[in-house]
Amino acid sequence: MKAVKSERERGSRRRHRDGDVVLPAGVVVKQERLSPEVAPPAHRRPDHSGGSPSPPTSEPARSGHRGNRARGVSRSPPKKKNKASGRRSKSPRSKRNRSPHHSTVKVKQEREDHPRRGREDRQHREPSEQEHRRARNSDRDRHRGHSHQRRTSNERPGSGQGQGRDRDTQNLQAQEEEREFYNARRREHRQRNDVGGGGSESQELVPRPGGNNKEKEVPAKEKPSFELSGALLEDTNTFRGVVIKYSEPPEARIPKKRWRLYPFKNDEVLPVMYIHRQSAYLLGRHRRIADIPIDHPSCSKQHAVFQYRLVEYTRADGTVGRRVKPYIIDLGSGNGTFLNNKRIEPQRYYELKEKDVLKFGFSSREYVLLHESSDTSEIDRKDDEDEEEEEEVSDS
């Protein structure tokens, strides 16, 4: 047995020297199953020590013995090498790596394909971009050619300038005609306003010169009216929910004299009315807003106003002074207001003086205006006579 082992060792040494490496049979079978493809030729790695080291004597003997058995029937898997040993296996990297070699080649091919694809895309894109640029350049050239032709046509003396001048003259003539037409319209409107015929005439249709009159008839616009509508006055001049027709003037004042109204019905004396506490008194049939109610049916709801006003007057020496005087104004009543048995005009102030008599509508009552310093002897006499008549009637 020892002789057989020594012969095998010698054979293995010779094969190592010749460059043929004999691997265990089990390892070769395993590699054939995993990698059916042809592996690249194994490159022999040079030994750092200079010579090819021979495996230990015990291992090749065992491997050779097992190899003889594997040649016959044995298919048992080979023993795994101890990872703790610092020695590396002398098999090339291609045999050590169990993963298929073509996977790495595919990865390299994919990496190499990317720049090729980019170049192809650029080649596909470049012709479209070049065509677009060519189209732009052609458009610019056309535009430049048109502009150059226009400039040359304008610079040329002849038909182009003549047509432009004719158009300008036609436009100027049309503008002048329109101006004349509108000036004539304005003159007509001014004449109508001066005569006083505005309103309905201002809405007449005025035909424009030239062309069909039916298509170009323009209605004249209505002029705005700046008159007072009275809406603001109604909003500000309401009392107890009723709109008052009258508004006091800026010169309204409260008098210093104590004026009074003495009403009489036929010869009967009625209670005295003191009218010096306000600047104005409204007389009418509407008791809700009237300061001095008048119950006669011939009187209006807002019949008249008794107003105090501050007015100027000239003294005896020629100087100008101011004084508060009483006035009466009719508010457009139906049956009118009478001052000393004379009807006064509506919406107009009339100055009142001492002992003036006022009557409203068809009422039989008379109102005599007096103040505190006026002579009331006649009224006192009438009162005494009335008292005597009452006593006589009572005695009889």
From Swiss-Prot:
GO cellular component labels: cytosol; nucleoplasm; nucleus; spliceosomal complex; U2 snRNP; U2-type precatalytic spliceosome
Annotated Pfam families: FHA (PF00498)
Residue positions where Phosphothreonine is found in the record: T57
Post-translational modification: Degraded by the proteasome upon binding to the SMAD1/OAZ1/PSMB4 complex.
Phosphoserine PTM sites in chain numbering: S35, S49, S52, S54, S58, S99, S153, S202, S394
Record field: compositional bias (Basic and acidic residues): 1-10, 107-142, 213-225, 373-382
GO biological process: miRNA processing; mRNA splicing, via spliceosome; negative regulation of canonical NF-kappaB signal transduction; U2-type prespliceosome assembly
Record's compositionally biased regions (Basic residues): 77-105
Biased composition (Acidic residues): 383-396
Record-listed cross-link Glycyl lysine isopeptide (Lys-Gly) (interchain with G-Cter in SUMO1), residues: K30
GO MF annotations, alphabetized: mRNA binding; RNA binding; transcription regulator inhibitor activity
Keywords, ordered alphabetically: Coiled coil, Disease variant, Epilepsy, Isopeptide bond, mRNA processing, mRNA splicing, Nucleus, Phosphoprotein, RNA-mediated gene silencing, Spliceosome, Ubl conjugation
Annotated tissue distribution: Ubiquitous, with highest expression in heart and skeletal muscle.
Subcellular location per the Swiss-Prot or TrEMBL entry: Nucleus
Glycyl lysine isopeptide (Lys-Gly) (interchain with G-Cter in SUMO2) crosslink location in chain: K30, K108, K223
Disease per UniProt entry: Neurodevelopmental disorder with hypotonia, craniofacial abnormalities, and seizures: An autosomal recessive disease characterized by severe psychomotor retardation, intractable seizures, dysmorphic features, and a lumpy skull surface. Patients are hypotonic and have poor feeding in the neonatal period.
Protein name, entry field: Smad nuclear-interacting protein 1
Principal location: nucleus
SUPFAM superfamilies registered for this protein in UniProt: SMAD/FHA domain
